């Protein structure tokens, strides 16, 4: 998919994804910044301004070389005619056999300008301020020759994505890469010149892989490419030749497996995992077990010699820089250091204020907050509970929680995701780490994030740290068990990631937030019919868990309003279910709400009726709109506050009902019946507390009105 990196309001990265190199090769992109599309983020804007001021690659920055003035952007008026002609020439080199491809290319007509401001009039054309800055031609079954020459008039072209088409052969990238760019296909010679270059870069004549050795056809061009590429994923292609010499400690992720490479592995890569080079019969040397036969193998390797030559020439270029450039660089570095020091001081002040305010939390935090929209990478940490993400809404498990602030998974996480469902699109851990992420909340068990993958799929990622005592095989088996659970009112587990220190669970995404956010936050209030519908769905899901998991004393164990999510039709789905066997025994009584039940506080026991008690609390909370006192505090036992809360609800009777339900006289009797069911579920005596089967049957018999029962309701209840 397409991703942009912005500076000074204009997209910068110029890449396209490989189409079909014996296998689809997808170029990973940097995470997106909401500050480009929205107003500057509340805490991130200072850093953005800092980067714009000091970045030597800024479009309006001073030309450090002093001899490449063509790359400076001073003023510009979009040339619609030139853009149209360039795109039509490019279109003429393409062909497609798919209806969608004909639809997209058919919208490219001379009578209509490609861009109107920031809107693209031609399908697949991305625009900014009237300029064509990107082409997104994906999944169109395109074939033919990628005619880069025809795109030369597009002076502000920054992004090309030709993913999932039928192009064959080598993948052209005629535009240089930023230091944060990724590359997943070979960079070969291209006639594109400085008109499509980012300032200070021209790598159009460089080559990375292929039978021809790397050649310097323009000796004055700096060899900046290899030191900037920190991730290469070239597996499952047919690349030939040898591996060039990379500077040490530059490549963070490398995968060259299943190609036709040969020769010795460069020493700088000798500490990589052997699987990085597997499937290349001609490779030898560490970390592979096959040793090179003789030193002559390396001497006979023309690619190695040429890559070394390029490295040497690059060093010579740097040494020959003029004193004028050196002084400019030193000035920029000095400014960077000063601004960085000021930024650090400002961050410390903000963190101290945040820490002070956290000592006096508000009575109830909204489950939907606009404070969590700071943009950053899903892989980076952020101050306080601000973790990157894009999107328009968030939900949280953070009511009255004294747990640690949300922390984003870091890029140090390595390994593969394990999928438990066959009907979901596949993605890997690196896709999650690159995804736009949005913090959803931080609860007792861990942190939640919404991740928007490059293909547009949205998932919820739950990060747990209180599960590091469970054995690996036991964890895998429990995940497989959860993957087999299928119910319309359960949030499906899609995949998981295991590491001893922490675990990641990946779920489907529910778009309408949590029940708690509608009851206590700034979401729209729920009427009586919606609340009854939600309680019915929760009861069905709880009954399903009890039927499918008869060996567990607590099939759910963590039922609360913030763990009841709602889809766009207000259908409820439960999350954080069946986690009791995974949580460390030392923390389970502090973390899970089921251990607030009276039988655990009084007798130290947990039964299958404990989930019924949690359901009763949920019913009373739903009818009254009142948050259970001390319900989420990290303490053991039932607690006098929660006992008093239940007694107060019972004593207030009908006067405690939430006025936001907009009830009528016709529904008063049904509301009273549901209230009585909730009270029966909250009985402290286990013998008098209803069992789940009786509770579910009573709830499903309710209607939104006292008299009459619609056919649709009868059919709906019959499917219980």
UniProtKB/Swiss-Prot annotation:
It is an enzyme of class 2 (transferase). It catalyses: L-seryl-[protein] + ATP = O-phospho-L-seryl-[protein] + ADP + H(+); L-threonyl-[protein] + ATP = O-phospho-L-threonyl-[protein] + ADP + H(+); L-tyrosyl-[protein] + ATP = O-phospho-L-tyrosyl-[protein] + ADP + H(+). InterPro entries: Kinase-like_dom_sf (IPR011009), Leu-rich_rpt (IPR001611), LRR_dom_sf (IPR032675), LRR_N_plant-typ (IPR013210), PRK1-6/SRF4-like (IPR046959), Prot_kinase_dom (IPR000719), Ser-Thr/Tyr_kinase_cat_dom (IPR001245). The chain crosses the membrane at residues 330-350. Belongs to the protein kinase superfamily. Interacts with KIP1. This is Pollen receptor-like kinase 1. It comes from Petunia integrifolia (Violet-flowered petunia). The gene is PRK1.
